[in-house]
């Protein structure tokens, strides 16, 4: 199997996905159940944005129940806010940072060093950095906070890491080492990634940006909206199930599973191989020495009547994470009349909520105020110096000689020779 034959010769790379990071959770659970060697023997696991969260959960050995409960728990909190991401209580960076401080083990930086790679984008020049060494657990958490920080969506002041400001790593390198043949890439968007949904539309147009290639389609457009504004818990849970199916298709196409599971899900018999081997009919197209069986079908979540038979652990974790408060009060506020009453009371409740949550965020920000103000002062000073230097260069630049006016003459008229002054000695009569 090429580079998969020797342990430690392949990498895993997870793209930025926002709330669609649930796709990474499902794909990881499929690899853990059906091909654990791909996770255990990986040389390094890269990630940008929410993909870095999935990568650190793999390195630290977190269970699928842990990942689903934390990710879908955040979606549930957002679902309860009347204005969704516009509500003043919405603070994704603070929430994730607190969850990481509570959940990561004290030696997480030791486990992550030299095995985890986090993509960061330096502000303001946009240069990409891959961080692979972490001195403390707090430094690891700060690197994760930086790669999750999407400008304006998460705030106005970028977080600091090792004396410099960084933002979302997906804005400069969304899929680290995607061009390397020995890297297994994972993404929830339709495209040419190893583990990704297969588009049902015949659109062949692709967009390559930020070291990432994806198809230009309506499916990807709506997936991009779900990344930032998840509509419901069920939609995110289905995306997690789709990640499991996409990873299973990846394994079956490369002959890394014992039996063709996807054929049974679509109620079809697998094509009978000519020589009696499951690897027959493979297309010998290489990416690091892997043969691909393109006859493996693409299965969507709606095609699976009972997902629990496919992965009981993942389905149990998703059902547990999607469970809402069963009380009558909670059910009333989720009903139609409750939603109408919520919006009718917004003019009365929103000002108090705004003052409360903004004041609380200000208290949390107080320890970082001196450093942030100093950074903003330096940023404004550099911008002013840049504007001054450009203005000075334009006003006091070298004076160019006046342009020579060329007179075009008709071919029927004699050309007027330019006047030249003779500097030689004068002739006497």
Curated annotation (Swiss-Prot):
Primary enzyme class: hydrolase
Keywords: Hydrolase, Lipid degradation, Lipid metabolism
GO MF term list: triacylglycerol lipase activity
Motif (DGA/G): 168-170
Catalytic reactions of this protein: a triacylglycerol + H2O = a diacylglycerol + a fatty acid + H(+)
Keyword check for Magnesium: no
Tissues/organs with expression: Expressed in brain and pituitary gland.
This enzyme's EC code(s): 3.1.1.3
Short sequence motif named GXSXG, residue ranges: 47-51
Motif extent (GXGXXG): 16-21
Residues of the PNPLA domain: 12-181
GO cellular component, one term: cytosol
Entry function: Has abundant triacylglycerol lipase activity.
PANTHER family reported for this sequence: CALCIUM-INDEPENDENT PHOSPHOLIPASE A2 IPLA2 -RELATED (PTHR12406), PATATIN-LIKE PHOSPHOLIPASE DOMAIN-CONTAINING PROTEIN 5 (PTHR12406:SF4)
Protein name: Patatin-like phospholipase domain-containing protein 5
Gene field: PNPLA5
